[in-house]
Amino acid sequence: MTTRTSLTIVLAAGEGTRMRSSLPKVLHPVAGRPLLAHVLAAAPHGEGDKLAVVIGPDHQAVADEARRIRPDAQIYVQTERLGTAHAVLAAKQAVAGGADDLLIAFGDTPLISAETFARLREPLRNGGALVVLGFRAVDPTGYGRLVVEDDRLAAIREQADASPDELKITLCNAGVMAIDGRIALDVLGAIGNANKKGEYYLTDAVGIVRERGLVAGVIETDEDEVRGINTKAQLAEAEAVMQARLRQAAMAAGVTLISPETIHLAADTTFGRDVTIEPFVVIGPGVSIGDGAVIHSFSHIVDTSLGKNTSIGPYARLRPGTSLGDGAKIGNFVETKAAQIDAGAKVNHLTYIGDAHIGPGANIGAGTITCNYDGFNKHKTEIGAGAFVGSNSSLVAPVRIGAGAYIGSGSVITRNVPDDALAVERNDQSVREGWATRFREAKLRAKKPKAG
């Protein structure tokens, strides 16, 4: 069977005024990934699949994000907002380039799946001219109704134009559409603007196709999958749906989530086998978790690689650039950033490790700080294999602690320490016998009321 080519046009020109944000609507995140990125990741991206993204004026950030996800993306600007068909024809050059299937999607529908795009194309393979994605709405008020006759799409009826019987229809238009690429440019060009708003509506393509004796059809999907995001409340709703999906997928893959509804995952989180995550854990973008890892409650992890059988938290914060080797441990109230912590190393309590490399089997005592920033630049701390850093130590970078070296508790280390050496930097202890008794007696005498 010959593989069909495709062109997906993603409409992302909306201002998103109801978001009340300076950030373009399609760049707001769901599960740590911009809305647009979810759509582009789901769109066909094989050898014969092309992508065009239609953006608004002054939306260079949207173009940059599109090319970050899909370097092959063609960018087109819709200078005027004159309806959905007008937006599609902003990419007229791409449509004219030819493809077997033209897919039209929206940059603010992050829950759409690759499987749905594939199902949308199937009727075109079987001779259909146009396919609309529909959903059964719990409350269809405000949606265009899909009027189906003899298993074919007869019309898309907007609510204001619907008859009483048509208003009872719960099958609604999701806006996503597929058109036979051979007729796409002709059909789109035939759409007029003879309506109250003077705009060009993509939904008119259904009538044009039927007038030409061609077949229009409907593919149904779940209502959640085609949620459009126009407000912060809708953004939160989409986040909830996405999180439920991600948790379910993680558990299906063998991850133990002790209290799933309290755990936040990112769209790109990857898991090994037998991973356990306790309640109230937040995992941001860029995290990979190895076999047997345990993440304890109230930990926050971003852009981090965890090796096999690692242990994190509770109350740990792992910031970007952190990597842990197999069996390494990060304990409670520990923060790391740009830190490589090798196999078997332990950082158990109340510690900051930034811009550092900790060798295998090293032990970092409670209250240790790598002093990595001098007010202008960051500097690196190197701690060798098997080194032992005593509690309440400050390691002033750049500095190297040799393999097997010991650092005495309370030390401020400013110079390199050789392998297997002991470094202690603190004043000699002074003991004054009886001082506490004399101090208390003097204070009590001072508190006696004066004779008067």
Curated annotation (Swiss-Prot):
Enzyme class label: transferase
Stretch list, region N-acetyltransferase: 254-452
PROSITE patterns to which the protein is assigned, alphabetical: HEXAPEP_TRANSFERASES (PS00101)
Chemical reaction(s) catalysed: alpha-D-glucosamine 1-phosphate + acetyl-CoA = N-acetyl-alpha-D-glucosamine 1-phosphate + CoA + H(+); N-acetyl-alpha-D-glucosamine 1-phosphate + UTP + H(+) = UDP-N-acetyl-alpha-D-glucosamine + diphosphate
Name of the protein described by the UniProt record: Bifunctional protein GlmU
Record function comment: Catalyzes the last two sequential reactions in the de novo biosynthetic pathway for UDP-N-acetylglucosamine (UDP-GlcNAc). The C-terminal domain catalyzes the transfer of acetyl group from acetyl coenzyme A to glucosamine-1-phosphate (GlcN-1-P) to produce N-acetylglucosamine-1-phosphate (GlcNAc-1-P), which is converted into UDP-GlcNAc by the transfer of uridine 5-monophosphate (from uridine 5-triphosphate), a reaction catalyzed by the N-terminal domain.
Cofactor: Mg(2+)
Active site residues per record: H349
Gene3D superfamilies: Hexapeptide repeat proteins (2.160.10.10), Spore Coat Polysaccharide Biosynthesis Protein SpsA, Chain A (3.90.550.10)
InterPro entries registered for this protein in UniProt: Bifunctional_GlmU, GlmU-like, GlmU_C_LbH, Hexapep, Hexapep_transf_CS, MobA-like_NTP_Trfase, Nucleotide-diphossugar_trans, Trimer_LpxA-like_sf
Residues engaged in binding acetyl-CoA: A366, N372, Y373, S391, S409, R426
Organism: Rhodopseudomonas palustris (strain HaA2)
Keyword Nuclease applies: no
GO biological process, alphabetically ordered: cell morphogenesis; cell wall organization; lipid A biosynthetic process; peptidoglycan biosynthetic process; regulation of cell shape; UDP-N-acetylglucosamine biosynthetic process
Annotated stretches, region: Linker: 233-253
Recorded family membership: In the N-terminal section; belongs to the N-acetylglucosamine-1-phosphate uridyltransferase family. In the C-terminal section; belongs to the transferase hexapeptide repeat family.
CDD domains, alphabetized: GT2_GlmU_N_bac, LbH_GlmU_C
Highest taxon listed in the record's lineage: Bacteria
UniProtKB keywords: Acyltransferase, Cell shape, Cell wall biogenesis/degradation, Cytoplasm, Magnesium, Metal-binding, Multifunctional enzyme, Nucleotidyltransferase, Peptidoglycan synthesis, Repeat, Transferase
GO cellular component terms, A-Z: cytoplasm; membrane
Pathway: Nucleotide-sugar biosynthesis; UDP-N-acetyl-alpha-D-glucosamine biosynthesis; N-acetyl-alpha-D-glucosamine 1-phosphate from alpha-D-glucosamine 6-phosphate (route II): step 2/2; Nucleotide-sugar biosynthesis; UDP-N-acetyl-alpha-D-glucosamine biosynthesis; UDP-N-acetyl-alpha-D-glucosamine from N-acetyl-alpha-D-glucosamine 1-phosphate: step 1/1; Bacterial outer membrane biogenesis; LPS lipid A biosynthesis
Comment on bound cofactor: Binds 1 Mg(2+) ion per subunit.
